[in-house]
Curated annotation (Swiss-Prot):
Post-translational modification: Isoform 1 and isoform 2 are glycosylated.
PTM-bearing positions, type Phosphoserine: S863
Entries under Pfam families matching the protein: Prominin (PF05478)
Species of origin: Homo sapiens
Signal peptide positions (record): 1-19
One term of GO molecular function: cadherin binding
Protein family per UniProt: Belongs to the prominin family.
Cited InterPro entries: Prominin
Pathology linked to this chain's protein: Retinitis pigmentosa 41: A retinal dystrophy belonging to the group of pigmentary retinopathies. Retinitis pigmentosa is characterized by retinal pigment deposits visible on fundus examination and primary loss of rod photoreceptor cells followed by secondary loss of cone photoreceptors. Patients typically have night vision blindness and loss of midperipheral visual field. As their condition progresses, they lose their far peripheral visual field and eventually central vision as well.
Record's miscellaneous remark: Is used as marker for hematopoietic stem and progenitor cells (HSPC) for somatic stem cell isolation.
GO cellular component: apical plasma membrane; cell surface; cilium; endoplasmic reticulum; endoplasmic reticulum-Golgi intermediate compartment; extracellular exosome; extracellular space; microvillus
Protein name: Prominin-1
Amino acid sequence: MALVLGSLLLLGLCGNSFSGGQPSSTDAPKAWNYELPATNYETQDSHKAGPIGILFELVHIFLYVVQPRDFPEDTLRKFLQKAYESKIDYDKPETVILGLKIVYYEAGIILCCVLGLLFIILMPLVGYFFCMCRCCNKCGGEMHQRQKENGPFLRKCFAISLLVICIIISIGIFYGFVANHQVRTRIKRSRKLADSNFKDLRTLLNETPEQIKYILAQYNTTKDKAFTDLNSINSVLGGGILDRLRPNIIPVLDEIKSMATAIKETKEALENMNSTLKSLHQQSTQLSSSLTSVKTSLRSSLNDPLCLVHPSSETCNSIRLSLSQLNSNPELRQLPPVDAELDNVNNVLRTDLDGLVQQGYQSLNDIPDRVQRQTTTVVAGIKRVLNSIGSDIDNVTQRLPIQDILSAFSVYVNNTESYIHRNLPTLEEYDSYWWLGGLVICSLLTLIVIFYYLGLLCGVCGYDRHATPTTRGCVSNTGGVFLMVGVGLSFLFCWILMIIVVLTFVFGANVEKLICEPYTSKELFRVLDTPYLLNEDWEYYLSGKLFNKSKMKLTFEQVYSDCKKNRGTYGTLHLQNSFNISEHLNINEHTGSISSELESLKVNLNIFLLGAAGRKNLQDFAACGIDRMNYDSYLAQTGKSPAGVNLLSFAYDLEAKANSLPPGNLRNSLKRDAQTIKTIHQQRVLPIEQSLSTLYQSVKILQRTGNGLLERVTRILASLDFAQNFITNNTSSVIIEETKKYGRTIIGYFEHYLQWIEFSISEKVASCKPVATALDTAVDVFLCSYIIDPLNLFWFGIGKATVFLLPALIFAVKLAKYYRRMDSEDVYDDVETIPMKNMENGNNGYHKDHVYGIHNPVMTSPSQH
């Protein structure tokens, strides 16, 4: 029933499902950012047996030994084909061959069944004749025991052998109890397992409409992204055009701007230089006049009579000789002015080159705004197309017959659930009968083995090696009786147990080998996929059932595998044959509509970097003459002292010499002149030095600017021509390329979205994984794990225990002779004939007819018995 139920679940979905088309791959492109919300199912994908799985594997190994051959796909196909025939001719060679193949495959199972049947037939017969034989005082029925030299050894061997066999039987009984309990507990889980599967199936039914709504909702996300780019066409398209033009234009404008800055710096440097030269001319004249005055004063002071007297005369002569150093630098007054160059630069600055450059920058930066102004109409048209695409997609999804599919499948699920819930109590009732029957069987075996254990226990504990067979104690005798009771029960019930073992073995082994194992390896599906097997008119049953196109390859194995991979129903069942979503979505048609609108997008840009006035301005600056100035002459003067000597040192030296003179007018006059020289240094020399420093800085600026000025301007003008030519010749192609790129971006959103719709409907929507899980639950879990595995473990354990009852009863019969109290025993009158064992035990032979009050009717020698 479980197998039929699982198959109906799968075929029910197949027979009532029609959906969209299948993409070329089951893997979504990495560029897609859409993802359907994950659906969580309650039923586990796999079933784990737990620790008892070790016992199940032990049974599987035994079955592999009994039936090691591979699954007979061809034989099963031919058998099913024969089964569908209205009349079977058993005399046909192919029928005979098929029968032989079946026998060959089932050889191991048949052999075990034959052995079991022999056991069933022979055990009652053997038991009957054994009983009759015992009643005739044969077969160990005579209560007399011969004394044997190896008797104690045999007793121990029989006891140990029986104990080992009883342990083996106990293990088998344990397997039986465990298997019986597993069936009981697992059947109780069936209701919860069924409810879990039906809950997952209803989750599938409920989630599918939500998935479709989610897919439709993602169009708004896509459209909003496209609208954002359309509303930002100034930054997206205009920015793209600007980024393409910027590398060829900005460097030129930056160079022109730096040149405009250089012109301003040149003007400032020339103005500073011109004013500095005028200041130097005036300051140098004043310095020369001051030095002339101080020299006149010093000469007048040196005319003092004291200078004629030794040693003052030497000091005066020294001072007189140094007066020639008090001169100014006349070359400072000869430096040429820069009025002409300054006038040229001022003429250049009459044209606002910096403003012209800013206009070039502005014309470039205005590209995004100009693009937005010129594309307003086109953007509105594209938005209308995008809105219409949304309506088309909504119409396509509404035409998908998913609601009809879900409604039909929902009815099927409800009917199946009602059927299962209606029959589960019956199943649980039958399970109770099975459990009670298994409990009785295991208890019966337990009773038998308990008698054996009690017999061993009483026999071993009550055995007295000094007692004769006729004088054995009550405990030992009870042990022997227990053993014989076990033997009697074994003969009475073991053949009945073997009947149960054979029947369950044949059923369980064949179901395991022909259903469970091939289901796991999918070989069973390959048999069902055999062309013309299930329907002689259809090559492939599923495609014929669904589409009436039996030539289309749609197999049970492929459908089951796809469902296990959580693939959507549409792609799993190749339902594009009834509703091709690719044709209805028609991605190229929708993207073509967007492309046609984008083709009408035209952008005109007139960019002029620098006019003729700006070019002439640069050329005039290059010809202003600052590159032809003799900067070395200016720099040479800036390195010289304004006076012929360091006036401060001269003043200190003069003051020292004056101090060496005797006090008087000459000394005072020289000190006053020294102070005057210090004042000249402070008021005349230091300002000149400051002016020379300013002149040096201005000269360096002009020298740096004028160095290679003509070449730089020529290079800038060449770059300007190149940039302007690039704008003239390439702007239109740049606009076209960026427009296409912009269009591909807009179209790409919808291509990805439409492809995602196709992929989702084909691979994700209405994932049939719950159906595969339900089939696994019905076959692999319920039938194989809940029923067949415990059933196989049951017959394996009970069969092992039953088989070992045979050697157990043999050893029990042998061993009972050593525990039971005998009616007679061997008597030895001659001590020389007493067995050595008896001598060792201190028994000198039996000389009386009555020993311990027990009549001894047989008084013969051992040879008579």
